[in-house]
Amino acid sequence: MMLVAAIPLAVAGCGGGDAGESATTVRVERPPFNADRAFQDLERQVAFGPRIPGSAGHAEQLEWLETELRSLAPTVFLQPFEHVTVDGNELALTNVIARFGPADGSRLLLLTHWDTRPKADQSSDEADRELPVTGANDGASGTAVLMELARMFNEQPPPGGVEFLFSDGEDYGPSTTDMFLGARHYIAGVGSENPPAYGILLDMVGDADPSFPVEAYSMEGAGQVVQRIWGIAADLGYRRFFPMDQTSRVLDDHVRFIEAGIPVANIIDFDYGPGHGFWHTPGDVVENTSAQTLFMVGDVVAEVVYRNR
């Protein structure tokens, strides 16, 4: 993801999708979100090493994702693809997709990226800028939350169709030409032939000092989805952590979906560390993440799924 610019937001009068108050509300009792297990998944991913396309850690993570999801979801399939970077590097990439319930056009898409940044290009120390990013928050956190949600849905099926997309190649970079690759490939394939109704993107959702203000592109292109998510967060007592206030434009996977006419809102904490100093730096490590933050985000998304379909 990349920061674009800061702009003020108005809460009222926002468009973007039909996932708001007009949706049928069906309340289904649900199991609790297991934060300890989710955090163990975050630690497991970090233990694989950097999950850069072509690396051993990337291959191990892919195997783990597929194996774990096949034990949980009725339908799991891989979406392999290739990409040649602006520098001429050939990347072998794979999206992992899992489905619960009907795969029709009313389904909700939950997505995150599972790859990590090849270089810590935002480090203040020039000597560190060639190092790979560990990706405890930027890569592992969203994946950990979705994996635990998959376990919940296996135990108690959601009241409607839900699709998981673990996208690859989101963070390769450094230019946007070589980013958001998995989202683009999904949209050109599954998302074109059988698009979901709307979606929720999780990115950088493990910060130990969390705050999830509304991201600007999300409000503009998926305003009703935003209203639902942030409203439920307030209902659950998380209003302080999900403020409806000014935010920035963040280029991320959700923008590609919005451009394709699919309203996707981004839950993202883009103020990671003092002075945003942990993003794309060696500071993106397990010690700067929190199981409690994973719980809060997982609790909100689970409630969206089980309450509002």
Question: What kind of feature is each model-predicted range?
Answer:
Residues 52-53, 82-85, 103-104, 114-118, ...:
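Solvent-exposed loop/turn segments at secondary-structure junctions
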Residues 10-13:
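C-terminal motif of bacterial Sec signal peptides marking the signal peptidase cleavage site
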Residues 198, 207-309:
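Active-site-adjacent substrate-binding region
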Residues 30, 35-48, 72, 94-155, ...:
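Catalytic-core environment of secreted peptidases
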